[in-house]
Swiss-Prot record:
It is found in: Cytoplasm. It holds the Pfam family RNase_H. Its EC number is 3.1.26.4. Monomer. Belongs to the RNase H family. Endonuclease that specifically degrades the RNA of RNA-DNA hybrids. The keyword Metal-binding applies. Keywords: Cytoplasm, Endonuclease, Hydrolase, Magnesium, Metal-binding, Nuclease. Binds 1 Mg(2+) ion per subunit. May bind a second metal ion at a regulatory site, or after substrate binding. This is Ribonuclease H.
Length: 163
């Protein structure tokens, strides 16, 4: 019996019309011959929040522990996870340093929790450089950001957090 986790590829991208502005995320999950596409958006948000939401939504879709390779063109996302910044910010009460709060603590909290449930390898890809799945996720994200009646990114809009 093979107890090794299922290997899943997750491709992500975020988009924002203005920063802040209306934003969207696009996510593609691939497992064997199965493909799932997810997208959504918010009426007022930031590009970094949409990059993070794309990863969060992809990981939230998984129902069992998986070995995930997550592709993103967001250095912010990759560096904060792979260089341990997000864990450090959390340990410091969501402070980057003595004078500066970490941005997007609500989403980092979710992402760190999801990463603890899976084996996640974050891989940076250059955006708009012909990477097929990244380009597709970009189209999903842009399309989502252009929808009418987008919901509120309540934490961003109502709590006035820095992003």
């Amino acid at each position: 019996m093979n107890d090794s986790p299922k290997k899943v590829l997750i491709y992500t991208d975020g988009a924002c019309s203005g920063n802040p502005g209306s934003g969207g995320y696009g996510t593609v999950l691939i497992y064997n011959n199965h493909r799932k596409e997810l997208s959504g958006g918010f009426r007022l948000t930031t590009n970094n929040r949409m990059e993070m939401m794309a990863a969060i939504v992809g990981l939230e879709t998984l129902t069992i522990k998986c070995a995930v390779t997550l592709y993103t063109d967001s250095r912010y996302l990759v560096d904060a996870i792979t260089k341990g910044w997000a864990k450090k910010w959390k340990a410091n009460g969501w402070k980057r340093n003595a004078k500066e709060n970490a941005k997007n603590p609500d989403l980092w909290e979710k992402l760190l929790d999801l990463c603890s449930q899976h084996e996640v390898d974050f891989v940076w890809v250059k955006g708009h450089a012909g990477h097929q799945e990244n380009e597709y996720c970009d189209r999903l994200a842009v399309r989502a950001s252009q929808q009418t009646n987008l919901p509120s990114d309540e934490v961003y809009e109502n709590k006035g957090i820095e992003t």
